Amino acid sequence: YKVYSLVNLSQLAGGMPDLEGFHTQEIELPQQKSLKMEEHNGRRYGTVVWRQYVLFPQRSGKMTIPSIKFEGIVVQQNRNIDPIDAFFNGGSTMVEVKKTIVAPSLTLQVDPLPSPRPANFSGAVGKFNISASLTPSEVKTNDALTLRITVSGSGNMKLMKAPVVNFPKDFETYDAKITDQTKVGRGGVSGNKIFDYLAVPRHPGEYTV
C-alpha cells in the first residue's frame, strides 16, 4: 500500500487490511515513515510505502485484496482569512484539514494447482532444491546420529512441513528440529529451511535411510 500526495501531508495513519483467504507475511519497513519525492505521469509526488505484504492464496478462483482507509492532516490556506489581518494580529492564514484517503481494492484470478496431486503433497509451492546428509555415517549401537535435510529456494516456505523420513524399524527416532533461515523481501520468501532428525540405532548392521 503506497500513498501519493501533491500536498503537505502529515500525521498519516492507516488500518490493517483484512487479507482473508491469504497466508500473509509482512515485509518489515522503517517505523519512522517520511515522504519521498517521486515522479508519476509527469508530476512530482510525495510518496510513502505504508505497508507491504507477500501473499500466498490459499484457494483458487477470484480473490479480492481489500481497500483500506488512511487518515492524514493537510495544511492549506484558509481563503476566508485576510492575509493582512492575520499578519498584524499575529495569526496565520494556514489551517490544518483532516483528509481521508482510500486505497482501491484489487481483484486477482488464482489458478488451481495441477492435478492429480501427489499423495504426499503438503502444500509447498515454489522453486526448491533439497539435499541430505548423515552425521556421522558410521555409529555404534545406541549412539545417536543426525540426518539433516536442507530445503533451499523460494516460495511459501513458511508453510512447508517437515518431510516424512522412513527410518529402519529398530531405530529410535525423535521429532525433527526445524531451523528457519528464510527472509521476506519484495521478491517473496527465500532462503533455507533445515530439518534435523535425531535417531538412535538399537542393533548393529548396515541400514539404508
Question: Model-derived features: where do they sit?
Answer:
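Regulatory and interaction patches adjacent to catalytic/ligand-binding sites
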Residues: 2-208
